Amino acid sequence: DARFEEYTAELFCKEVSANTVSLHYTLKAPEKYGIEATDATFGQFEREPEAVKAAAENMRQALLGFNYDDLNVQNKITYDILNYRLKLMKKSADYTMYEEPLGLVSGVQTQLPVVLSEYRFYDKEDVEVYLALVRQTEEYFEEIMIFEKKKAEMGLFMPDQAVETVIGQCRAFLEMGNGNYLYSTFADRVMELNTLTEKEKSDYIQENALAISDYVFPAYERMTEELEQLKGSGKNEKGLVYFPKGKEYYELLARQSTGSRRSVEELKDLTRRQINEDLTAMEQVLGLTTKEAKEAAAVITDKKAEQILEQLKEGSKTAFPEPPQ
């Protein structure tokens, strides 16, 4: 058990330190886990399936070196989870080019500014690391666009409608200009650091402003330009399943997301059952019959969005104070 726990601890340290952002968000004091300071990085954007397979196989072979029967209950659970995840990791390597870093909801273009704006500063070193990360934005975006161009060559690029949405998100970020929250949130966090002198705070705020204008904004501008050039490359507008082997990849994603070996159809059936059970429970709590619940739902769907919002606004007055004008 001790040897297995040492292995999992090493694996944890290796995985969590793969990129600076994950490390900082996970551990306040990495040195307590024996993790030494390294150069700031957003992590390697792995595009080679064989490299992913090799990494997964190496980790799994190390795992199989432990005698399962010798482990205690807790470690057996950890073993099973790791074994399951590593098998999926190896399978997913064949679908590396199906991944989409520029997702419409949680893509890099929308999440990176949020992640940076919430990056906590505990000391001066954190500020230095943060600024080093900001200066790597262009390089990071270049790696993503190399990946997207390769997807386009393979016929796996997003449709034009999605491209327009991503471009719109990039432009909206750029249009914030001097009012961009990466300026204000950085200044707020730096000003709260009592270990810095006033001059250091002022210097860091200026450094951040220069880094945003010299690295972040150009990265978004370049991405916008290159996405414009890739328009027309995406032929599939019907969804993931309509790509070659898209159905198999979707099934793999379902396994990764749920941790279940059930088929997609079985999961859909379970979801429908759960929805029906929840609706029945809600009807009982509200004292509604099934007919009354359906009639209430029909009334809502017949209304326009403005009417629904106005109704919610009126209904909230009894529970919330009036908003400022």
Label every model-predicted segment:
Residues 1-325:
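N-terminal maturation segment of proteins
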